Amino acid sequence: MEKNNETLRVLRHSCSHIMAQAVQKLFPQAKLAIGPATDEGFYYDFDLIDGHAFTEEDLAKIEEEMKNIIKQNLTFEKYVIPDVEKQIAEFKAEGEIYKAELLEEHKNDNPTLYLTKDKDGNVLFNDLCAGPHIPNTSYIKGNAIKLLKVAGAYWRGNEKNKMLQRIYATAYWNKEDLQAYLTFLEEAAKRDHRKLGTQLDLFSVREEIGGGLVLWHPNLYTVREEIENYWRSEHRKRGYVIVQTPQIAKSKLWEISGHMDHYKENMFFIQKDEDSDEQYVVKPMNCPFHILIYQANRHSYRSLPLRMAELGTVYRKEKSGALSGLTRVQGFTQDDAHIFCTPEQLVDEINQIIDFVADTMKIFKMGFEVELSTRPESYVGDLKNWELAEAGLKEAMDKRGMKYDINEGDGAFYGPKIDFKVKDALGRTWQCATIQLDFNLPERFDIKYQDKDGSMKTPVMLHRVIFGSMERFHGILIEHYAGAFPTWLAPTQVAIVPISNEKHADFAEQVYKKMRDAGIRVKLDDRSESMNYKIRESLQDKKIPYVCVIGDKEIETNAVAVRKRGVGQVGTVSVDEFIANIEKEIKDRA
């Protein structure tokens, strides 16, 4: 069997069957739900009807039993179910209610079981499954599998259903690849933005407020301010106008936009006033507001393109189990922009957005991958316009020599799109920037411009984000930098540590004020702790880029002894020179 990503998924899928077999041997009361392969491994959902909760000790026993099963060189055999109703009845009789439910749904799809057999042909285990699987367990190396953790998972992801126990695991072709992945997980755990969020006092999510609603603490809001300043400056340089729109709007607006038909379950509604029949909605998107601003004036081909941007906060309902730190929230700020242009301007506008994305991600030292999603089976708008739009997106990327993948049929019903997946320091990809064409909203709101021949035409509309969600992007940045923000973003850029408060505090105070007046984010650490403790805490624990130590020699020479995060001592420089160096780093966004 050729070893590639596709066959690795097959191997992992087979491992999920082996895990289910091991669990049912050790825990006969366990009932099976689903167990697919994933990009990073596999999982299986179990219902332990006696209420037992899997422990770390249980995972070790299950993993050992899996290795015993693998050693037996068992085969996987596909079996077409001849009598589906009989099989459903058997599942129910065995208490396998989840398998019975799945089979009932797929009974007209030629459903199959996969049988796990020993060398004598005895069936040791079976599972409802479409496959495929590896031929036998000899393809799996016992030292290349690892059970990772247990988590709760609602049956079918529905909070109204029973909570099951999901065992996450992974498997590789060999132990070296497994060890590399486990090392990666260790590093990812150290960088977890939820952990660093507490350690560095960056943000919190409080039960009293609600899940997925973020409190930005001063440290992280300082980072956000710097990024928003960059955002505003760059947008103005690139010809955008910046707007602000309300947090709520009448439901009628969302009926016109189509959100009430397609997005209602994700929207927050405000209770109707007793004196009015008007229903208000907390905005899930900024687009309709920008269209209304467009409508406020007459437009001709000469006034286009109109590039309109907003740091607009939106709210979208999420299931509580899906919420996670900053990366999956219910209230977030989008760096949203909508561009209204003529068809002839489309390719140039796309190119300018791609430049914007590339320039921005370069600042954060992030690469990116690109995907083009094309027309789905169900779509709105004219087929010719779709073909022109897709051709325009391809042309813009092809002219730049950009590599991109095509997701056929994966575009939104209202237009094709380009997605940019940024790569962080660990090589993980995150969905951030998007360019989305929209044939739906311009028609729904009947927006027009006057063309050269005097006729009224519908403009091309582009939705565009660079960061996506500000909350999500900051979560990504925390992990990308492992909390050690570069100087221009660091909440505190310099810590000043006097060796002796009695002898050196006055000069340290002077240096502190001079740096503060220069616009540097600086703190004076005049606590009674030891000098080494304060240096270590600043550089390692609080991840401050620079520490300036002040003693007798520094006072004599009007200088500071500089320690740099990740480097250590870098020498003594004059106060003015140090300030100039920091100012340059900040200006260069280093």
Annotate each language-model stretch with its function.
Residues M1-K31, D39, D45-A590:
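NTP/phosphate- and nucleic-acid-binding module
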